[in-house]
């Protein structure tokens, strides 16, 4: 056991949690003790997500969570984010340049154009509405809960 900041940490529990996260996010590594810097970029991204969820946040801010991850692993990561939102009630605020990705998992999508909120749209809104919002030409901010 380690004493860090006057808390007791159980090394076996930490290792088991690491193994669970490795399986959950399909992190390709030789062992749980392999240095993260020795992993591929995509697996490093998954480790970042695993670390963030280990803290059991109520709100999680993620930016480009699938950057550097292969197509098959993208779906796994996105499904994991959705599952943590639904099962654990974690609010996830995500930034991404991948509109299709956002539309596939988000309840609402805020469009920022030239540093200003242009619109808040539903993923089912039309491509034309998204285009206008991204161009900063949307007439009003739509907030629909």
Q: Where are each of the predicted segments found?
A:
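A short, proline-enriched helix->beta-strand linker immediately N-terminal to the Walker B motif
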Residues: 54-58
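Short, glycine/charged-rich "phosphate-handling" switch motifs in NTP-dependent
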Residues: 108, 120
């Amino acid at each position: 056991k380690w004493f860090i900041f006057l808390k007791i940490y159980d090394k076996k529990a930490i290792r088991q949690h690491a193994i669970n996260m490795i399986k959950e996010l399909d992190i390709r590594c030789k062992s749980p003790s392999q240095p993260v810097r020795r992993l591929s970029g995509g697996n490093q991204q998954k480790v970042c997500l695993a670390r963030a969820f280990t803290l059991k946040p109520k709100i999680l801010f993620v930016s480009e969570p699938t950057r550097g991850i292969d197509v098959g692993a993208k779906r796994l990561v996105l499904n994991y984010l959705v599952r943590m939102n639904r099962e654990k009630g974690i609010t996830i605020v995500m930034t991404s340049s991948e509109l299709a990705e956002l539309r596939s998992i988000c309840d609402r999508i805020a469009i920022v154009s030239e540093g200003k909120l242009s619109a808040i749209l539903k993923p089912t809104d039309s491509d034309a509405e998204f285009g206008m919002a991204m161009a900063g030409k949307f007439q009003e901010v739509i907030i629909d809960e």
